[in-house]
Amino acid sequence: MKEYKDTLNLNTTTFSMKGNLSVNEPKTYAKWQEQQAFKRMQNRKDNHGDFTLHDGPPYANGHLHLGHALNKILKDIVVKREYFKGNKIYYTPGWDCHGLPIEQQILERLEKEKTSLENPTLFREKCRDHAKKFLEIQKNEFLQLGVLGDFEDPYKTMDFKFEASIYRALVEVAKKGLLKERHKPIYWSYACESALAEAEVEYKMKKSPSIFVAFGLKKESLEKLKVKKASLVIWTTTPWTLYANVAIALKKDAVYALTQKGYLVAKALHEKLAALGVVDSEIVHEFNSNDLEYLKATNPLNQRDSLITLGEHVGLEDGTGAVHTAPGHGEEDYYLGLRYNLEVLMSVDERGCYDEGIIHNQLLDESYLGEHVFKAQKRIIEQLGDSLLLEQEIEHSYPHCWRTHKPVIYRATTQWFILMDEPFIQNDGSQKTLREVALNAIEKVEFVPNSGKNRLKTMIENRPDWCLSRQRKWGVPLAFFIDKRTNKPCFESEVLEHVANLFEKKGCDVWWEYSVKDLLPPSYQEDAMHYEKVMHILDVWFDSGSTFKAVLEDYHGEKGQSPSDVILEGSDQHRGWFQSSLLIGCILNNQAPFKKVITHGFIVDEKGEKMSKSKGNVVSLDNLLKKHGSDVVRLWVAFNDYQNDLRVSQTFFIQTEQHYKKFRNTLKFLLANFSDMDLKNLERSHDFSPLDHFILEALETTSTGVNSAFEEHDFVKGLNILMAFVTNELSGIYLDACKDSLYCDSKNNEKRQAIQMVLLAIASKLCYFLAPILTHTIEEVLEHSQVLCAFLQAKDVFDLKGISVSEKLHLKEFKKPENFEAVLALRSAFNEELDRLKKESVVKNSLECAIEVKEKALRENLIEELLMVSFVGVAKEKLSETPAFTLFKAPFYKCPRCWRFKSELENTPCKRCEEVLKER
């Protein structure tokens, strides 16, 4: 029998089925760098508008992990999506270079080397070198992810110009009257020996003593109440702060019950406390809390007076309704102390140990000196004697240092604060507080997901003043001078601008290197002896929070517009970078420095647990890239609901690889089947079949859905729509139905050429939608298809832009054939019947079949294509409703070329194939 294989259009493509991504991607990326791909993104000729994504800086310490990859890949997808829409792109990656983790690394290294480094300039130099080293490491690791940005000129918070910009932002805060030095309690990390801002605190479960203590009322107070004995009962989980108690806070207008044994508690809590055995059950007298105000009790620990006050923070859900108050160790206590002019006692040093103040003020005996407060609690509880009514242990959520993961304490120190509730002048001349301005600004910002808006609002509503000062060395100094004659800071513009200029030229190391005289402008140098330097450094959240100024505003738009269009970070940044950026933006410009906030979740293991080396559940980013390639990692990011935590394991990446293969193999099939197309056919109109119109309409519907989802940054929804189209309509229906024409019709056959145009349109849309995600792969697709490049008028991936399929194909509309759904329903029923015949060995495949249908209205050619049968006819006899067709073996012979049963003679080509063979 004659062999006809060579007469078929079995086209191939040099685009490989296997991507070999880990080998090929670095070559592609090197080409992009050589061709300055990002500069092309910045200088788009068909510019439809500008788009700025402002990068929240990662910390320049350590290697990248999968969480970094998630963040940078999402940003890259957003940026590239905007670029392919036709926008000019601004995206400058940056690094946060100052701060405690680097200091700790250097201190640990010095400890191992058994050396000390008292010189702050040399110490800062080592910190700077450490940051430089890891900045370069991380930069190269980011590039492996296929991300593009201005990596040639990234921003670094330790650059001299940047440090000067941070300082100038601080100066603006001071000039607007929002920067104040205050002695008040703040979070204190005894492990770091430094103040902490709220954003540097994390909450974890901690076991603490829970004690109920009786404070006996003084004689004069008992007389006023006309009772013989009464003790207010307080509840606390911080017995170590009892030494500093100066007051007890009650709830205003609440009823307090005095028991038979003389214990005074909130009546609303009496029954619960009696059940616990804290107090006895019989009530002998009731008092309104307002009548107890200004009475005095005695602290059983040191016999000092404790004033009875009324506080709005007192609740009646837990405890006793009487709150132990130590203004030196609690923020609410501190503000209550301002109202009642209470003494602020604080005798705990930087290491969390009792200092000599306990002796001078007769707060504790000498044996407690130098003892850590947590260690001392057992002795303090014992010292309470009969005043201790109940001791338990509870496990509760407690603030910890986010760097050392050790518990923190509240400790009153002199620090610098940005005031949240101090009115300042707005651009329109009105006066508002920072809290008010920030809350108003949030309303004008779009959040993805929308729940982020309320989350940030709640945090701003409840946050305390921002503690800016840190007692460390590696950071931007709080570079102000205190005038010793007035004990007030010097905020004169001439002085502040002189310091800023020094920082810009020589870096802020000069604050440690230069004398006061050398730091002052000439007109102030004669009075240098009257000034002293503030030696705190700035909270690093102020560094990163002012990046919009240093990157966008200071460059006057060269690196993007302010406010930026989008910022995109992990959901933990509601309490970190989102807040610090918002507050500084509202101080400097009375508005948020961003228009849209997108947040993502965290990377967890397949059980939903946080990854850690100790658990052994860490998935290595480097190993993933080597095994799967960056495009698969990128697809994994896009194919997940990033707004929630992302579960990860090798299994998930294997699944993603299957998705990748589906897209890749589909593109390979498309490329192969229009590879022999004459480029002249691209410009003319074609006669598209009903089946072509069906798939083009499906493509249009898919495009609308994907575009809509991608516009909302819902990449997983968009990709699922795209994958459903590829799997169902394209692979499941259209491509199978077209194979006969593609392989067996003449190359110049109009029907075949129309199909090729449709395949080109589909490939174009796939490339457009996948390019922001699978950028390497789409670049490879275009490298291997001259026809597709000509159709798109693109020489590479960065020439891609959205196309109108109807315009490209010279079609006014897509007309899906009538009764098409009925044909699809027929196809489904047919496949069931075909499976039965195969099992009974009646036929081997659909090509052996012929079918008769009851309705003439159904297009016979369309049925033949969709069902891939060899003959379709209309039944002469009436058919039953189910099934509405008759299936039987085709009455003709198998064509040895196309394999359809249409030949009138055995081993002879059918009429269609004979015609094609004549043309060859």
From Swiss-Prot:
<dbReference type="GO" id="GO:0005829">
    <property type="term" value="C:cytosol"/>
</dbReference>
<keyword id="KW-0067">ATP-binding</keyword>
<keyword id="KW-0862">Zinc</keyword>
<keyword id="KW-0963">Cytoplasm</keyword>
<dbReference type="Pfam" id="PF08264">
    <property type="entry name" value="Anticodon_1"/>
</dbReference>
<dbReference type="InterPro" id="IPR009080">
    <property type="entry name" value="tRNAsynth_Ia_anticodon-bd"/>
</dbReference>
<keyword id="KW-0547">Nucleotide-binding</keyword>
<feature type="short sequence motif" description="'HIGH' region">
    <location>
        <begin position="58"/>
        <end position="68"/>
    </location>
</feature>
<dbReference type="InterPro" id="IPR033708">
    <property type="entry name" value="Anticodon_Ile_BEm"/>
</dbReference>
<dbReference type="InterPro" id="IPR023585">
    <property type="entry name" value="Ile-tRNA-ligase_type1"/>
</dbReference>
<dbReference type="InterPro" id="IPR013155">
    <property type="entry name" value="M/V/L/I-tRNA-synth_anticd-bd"/>
</dbReference>
<protein>
    <recommendedName>
        <fullName>Isoleucine--tRNA ligase</fullName>
        <ecNumber>6.1.1.5</ecNumber>
    </recommendedName>
</protein>
<dbReference type="GO" id="GO:0006428">
    <property type="term" value="P:isoleucyl-tRNA aminoacylation"/>
</dbReference>
<dbReference type="InterPro" id="IPR002300">
    <property type="entry name" value="aa-tRNA-synth_Ia"/>
</dbReference>
<feature type="binding site">
    <location>
        <position position="898"/>
    </location>
    <ligand>
        <name>Zn(2+)</name>
    </ligand>
</feature>
<keyword id="KW-0030">Aminoacyl-tRNA synthetase</keyword>
<dbReference type="InterPro" id="IPR009008">
    <property type="entry name" value="Val/Leu/Ile-tRNA-synth_edit"/>
</dbReference>
<keyword id="KW-0648">Protein biosynthesis</keyword>
<feature type="binding site">
    <location>
        <position position="613"/>
    </location>
    <ligand>
        <name>ATP</name>
    </ligand>
</feature>
<dbReference type="GO" id="GO:0000049">
    <property type="term" value="F:tRNA binding"/>
</dbReference>
<dbReference type="GO" id="GO:0004822">
    <property type="term" value="F:isoleucine-tRNA ligase activity"/>
</dbReference>
<dbReference type="GO" id="GO:0002161">
    <property type="term" value="F:aminoacyl-tRNA deacylase activity"/>
</dbReference>
<dbReference type="InterPro" id="IPR014729">
    <property type="entry name" value="Rossmann-like_a/b/a_fold"/>
</dbReference>
<feature type="short sequence motif" description="'KMSKS' region">
    <location>
        <begin position="610"/>
        <end position="614"/>
    </location>
</feature>
<dbReference type="InterPro" id="IPR050081">
    <property type="entry name" value="Ile-tRNA_ligase"/>
</dbReference>
<feature type="binding site">
    <location>
        <position position="913"/>
    </location>
    <ligand>
        <name>Zn(2+)</name>
    </ligand>
</feature>
<dbReference type="InterPro" id="IPR002301">
    <property type="entry name" value="Ile-tRNA-ligase"/>
</dbReference>
<feature type="binding site">
    <location>
        <position position="895"/>
    </location>
    <ligand>
        <name>Zn(2+)</name>
    </ligand>
</feature>
<comment type="subunit">
    <text>Monomer.</text>
</comment>
<dbReference type="GO" id="GO:0005524">
    <property type="term" value="F:ATP binding"/>
</dbReference>
<feature type="binding site">
    <location>
        <position position="910"/>
    </location>
    <ligand>
        <name>Zn(2+)</name>
    </ligand>
</feature>
<keyword id="KW-0479">Metal-binding</keyword>
<feature type="binding site">
    <location>
        <position position="569"/>
    </location>
    <ligand>
        <name>L-isoleucyl-5'-AMP</name>
    </ligand>
</feature>
<keyword id="KW-0436">Ligase</keyword>
<comment type="similarity">
    <text>Belongs to the class-I aminoacyl-tRNA synthetase family. IleS type 1 subfamily.</text>
</comment>
<dbReference type="InterPro" id="IPR001412">
    <property type="entry name" value="aa-tRNA-synth_I_CS"/>
</dbReference>
<dbReference type="Pfam" id="PF00133">
    <property type="entry name" value="tRNA-synt_1"/>
</dbReference>
<dbReference type="GO" id="GO:0008270">
    <property type="term" value="F:zinc ion binding"/>
</dbReference>
<comment type="function">
    <text>Catalyzes the attachment of isoleucine to tRNA(Ile). As IleRS can inadvertently accommodate and process structurally similar amino acids such as valine, to avoid such errors it has two additional distinct tRNA(Ile)-dependent editing activities. One activity is designated as 'pretransfer' editing and involves the hydrolysis of activated Val-AMP. The other activity is designated 'posttransfer' editing and involves deacylation of mischarged Val-tRNA(Ile).</text>
</comment>
